[in-house]
Curated annotation (Swiss-Prot):
Highest taxon of source: Bacteria
Species this chain originates from: Ruthia magnifica subsp. Calyptogena magnifica
InterPro entries given in the database record: LpxK, P-loop_NTPase
Reaction(s) the record says it catalyses: a lipid A disaccharide + ATP = a lipid IVA + ADP + H(+)
Function: Transfers the gamma-phosphate of ATP to the 4'-position of a tetraacyldisaccharide 1-phosphate intermediate (termed DS-1-P) to form tetraacyldisaccharide 1,4'-bis-phosphate (lipid IVA).
A single BP term in Gene Ontology: lipopolysaccharide core region biosynthetic process
Record keywords, A-Z: ATP-binding, Kinase, Lipid A biosynthesis, Lipid biosynthesis, Lipid metabolism, Nucleotide-binding, Transferase
Family: Belongs to the LpxK family.
GO CC terms, sorted: plasma membrane
Enzyme Commission number(s) of this protein: 2.7.1.130
Protein name (record): Tetraacyldisaccharide 4'-kinase
Molecular functions (GO terms): ATP binding; tetraacyldisaccharide 4'-kinase activity
């Protein structure tokens, strides 16, 4: 795009960005002064969110936290908005048998990897209430929802992109911000997904293995080294996934889809018969396809002992 045209477009978005900022501040203030009612709960709620749009790796952290507390004997439940799913009315309890087209990819992925109840509702406060009423839980983790102030919370965790940070520092739609950077001063923990800054905790996303989408067969990280493969990603920042595959020595052809994209089998039909590599988030939308050349990269979030110790103390 011509730089002058881009500059004009950016300049025209500045007032909208300013309005978004004012609305964000005013809306939060209305909850602070109790103009809007905050829904409180009898069990602690941990929110894992961010102040920017786009993927920052929240879901692997939610899964890691859920598994950590589950191992401690907690009865954990998760709530989510259910982005990309067709379910829009009321709450839906997601389990491993739920249709991904109803739930969206992230809630189903969390349910599959944790074997814990996941309740989706665009009203997260209602999701928490229904989760408590329908399931035996004593700790709730909210996948995203930092800006859903109607839902009371005991711990706020913000995940930030350690490379992109806060982009150009502007609010939507001119920049990536949903809330001011100063919001970080009021949260309990900031987790950096790439690198480390003062006052932030690091998380290590560890590549584990490749798993066949159809058969569950497992292969080591070196299995596709030197081979030609198709890389498929419908996530917030696909370049991270592609770069990880390239670092494994894979000759990769990139195929980028929109975040939360619902795949059709025709999307994954290529002229050659090279393996198709995808994320776990993409995998849950492709299990019904008749293609044994699809593999997903299993990734785990490793949270620091220092972070977990301080989180336990907060609860």
């Amino acid at each position: 795009m011509n730089l002058n045209i881009r500059g004009i477009i950016n300049y025209s978005l500045l007032p909208i960005s300013g309005i978004f900022y004012l609305v964000s501040v005013f809306r939060k203030w209305l909850y602070r002064v109790n103009f809007f009612k905050v829904q409180k709960f009898k069990y602690p709620v941990i929110v894992v969110g961010n102040i920017t749009v786009g993927g920052t790796g929240k879901t692997p952290i939610v899964i890691a936290l859920a598994q950590y507390f589950k191992q401690q004997g907690k009865q954990v439940g998760i709530v989510s908005r259910g982005y990309g799913g067709a379910h829009h009315q009321g709450s839906l309890l997601v389990n491993k048998d739920t249709n991904v087209y109803l739930s969206g990819d992230e809630p189903l992925l969390i349910a599959l990897q944790t074997d814990l109840p996941v309740m989706i509702n665009k009203n997260r406060a209602k999701a928490v209430k229904d989760l408590i009423n329908q399931c035996q839980v004593d700790l709730i983790i909210s996948d995203d929802g930092l800006q859903h102030y109607k839902m009371d919370r005991d711990v706020e965790i913000v995940v930030i992109d350690g490379i992109k940070r806060f982009g150009n520092g502007f609010f939507l739609p001119l920049g990536p911000l949903r809330e001011s950077i100063t919001r970080l001063k009021s949260v309990d923990f900031v987790i950096n997904n790439a690198g480390l800054c003062a006052g932030e905790f690091s998380v290590k996303l560890t590549l584990k293995m490749f798993v066949n989408v159809k058969t569950g067969e497992e292969k080591s990280l070196n299995y596709f080294k030197g081979k030609y493969c198709h890389g498929v990603a419908g996530i917030g920042h696909p370049e991270r996934f592609f770069n990880a595959l390239i670092r494994l020595g894979i000759n990769l052809e990139h195929h980028i889809f929109a975040d939360h994209y619902i795949y059709q089998q025709s999307d994954l039909v290529f002229e050659d018969n090279h393996p198709i590599l995808m994320t776990a988030k993409d995998c849950v939308k492709c299990t019904q396809f008749e293609n044994d050349q699809m593999w997903y990269l299993q990734v785990e979030a490793d949270l620091s002992d220092d972070f977990l110790k301080k989180l336990d103390a907060k609860l």
